[in-house]
A protein has these predicted regions:
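SAM-dependent methyltransferase catalytic region
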Residues: 1-376, 380, 385, 389
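Class I S-adenosyl-L-methionine
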Residues: 391-393
């Protein structure tokens, strides 16, 4: 049962996967499980297990390579907002796989994991989408020829399964990948519109930063309705669609392992202006020195334009983190007052992990000790220590 019904369906996620270090570590853990089982098969009187092992040896020159490839294909998933990081993560898994081969004869085609390790914003996107909501978002003309959302998901999952378990580099495989991407983009467009509607229902506006020429400082922001291009820049990742088999049918991921960013979500002037001045990049720079250098840089119209555009990307996202239902535990009430107005990304990631995890799933997350004491993390602490079982600190 463990070999055939459990291990192939274990789903492990890193929602801030970076270069894939935690995914490689997860792979090694599963390898140990497989190795222990295979080591016992020859001592058991189970004809099914022995037949399985004989067939594996017939089809694959290296059983170690086969096991690693199966784990990478069926068990490991990752998302990162930086596309370059996801490419490095895939490469890292490929290198770990190839390292198990002792000769060229043991090598097989690399696993197809373009839809396992994906770029996107893990914190912004739809967790679940029901068929009715999806259909209602389409106009009548589109509805007349458009497959239902459920049909789209079923078709995509079927194609994904074919793609992931294909064993060649043939042109038809590349065509299959392109076809999956094309069909996925059609659905993503509708999901983006639904997400934009969600921002609108929350009363979130785009606050465009301005510059007061007379006072030579930032002016009052101009508020307007959020547009699709504003949303696209956030790189939304719709979990309920991209991993519908896991989120929808299995109820979430079995395990989540991650080391999310520990930083306050707000504009960082020094970080921004480092790109334009060597002085700013110096480690020992006083606040007054920085402000003086910043003032000089902002006299350049192009730099000023870039700075205002940079500032404009924060307010609507902050409002989403504060008001979205999926992040309802970010603000705590202490003595009748709201506590914890600062938005720290590790807090957002912590709650998102709970959203993505299955009912009996487990999560290993690297977070600062402040979660034990900060007033603003009261609700998160209650989730961790009262609604969950903490097995290690």
């Amino acid at each position: 049962q463990l070999l055939f019904d459990i291990l192939p369906y274990i789903s492990i996620l890193d929602p801030a996967c970076g270069s894939g270090a935690f995914l490689v570590a997860a792979m090694k853990t599963l390898i140990n499980l497989y190795s222990a089982i295979i080591g016992k098969i020859e001592f058991l009187n189970d004809i099914n297990l022995k037949t399985w092992l004989v067939e594996i040896h017939k089809k694959h020159a290296s059983i170690n390579y086969f096991i690693k490839k199966s784990i990478i294909t069926d068990n490991l998933f990752g998302v990162d907002i930086m596309e370059e990081a996801t490419e490095i993560a895939k490469l890292r898994l490929f290198l770990a796989l190839v390292a198990s081969a002792t000769s060229v004869d043991e090598l097989e085609p690399l696993p197809n994991i373009d839809f396992n390790i994906m770029p996107g914003n893990s914190l912004i996107g739809l967790l679940k989408v029901d068929n009715k909501t999806f259909e209602e978002s389409l106009d009548l003309v589109t509805q007349s020829y458009y497959h239902t959302y459920a049909e789209k998901l079923e078709e995509r999952n079927r194609l994904l399964d074919t793609y992931r378990h294909a064993s060649s580099y043939a042109d038809d495989l590349r065509a299959l990948r392109d076809n999956i991407e094309k069909k996925s983009n059609e659905v993503r467009g509708t999901l983006d519109r639904l997400l934009l509607d969600e921002f609108d229902k929350l009363g979130i506006k785009y606050e465009e930063a301005t510059w007061d020429e007379k006072k030579n400082k930032e002016g009052k922001p101009k508020k307007r309705a959020l547009r699709m291009d504003d949303l696209k820049r956030l790189k939304p990742f719709h979990w309920g669609f991209e991993f519908s088999e896991i989120i929808g049918k299995r109820g979430g991921f079995n395990a989540i392992v991650t080391n999310p960013p520990w930083e306050i979500f707000k504009p960082n002037g020094k970080e921004f202006f480092e790109e334009y001045s060597e002085l700013v990049s110096k480690k020992k720079m006083s606040i007054k020195e920085f402000e003086k250098e910043q003032g000089k840089l902002l006299k350049d119209k192009d730099i000023l334009k870039a700075w205002l555009a940079y500032l404009s990307e924060y307010p609507h996202v902050s409002e989403f983190y504060r008001n979205a239902t999926q992040y309802k535990n970010q603000i705590s009430i202490v003595n009748g007052k709201k506590a914890g107005t600062d938005i720290n990304l590790y807090k957002i990631f912590t709650e998102q992990c709970f959203n993505l995890m299955s009912k009996y799933g487990e999560c290993g997350i690297v977070i600062p000790s402040g979660i034990y004491t900060d007033l603003g993390t009261k609700r998160l602490r209650e989730i961790l220590f009262e609604e969950s079982l903490v097995t290690g600190l």
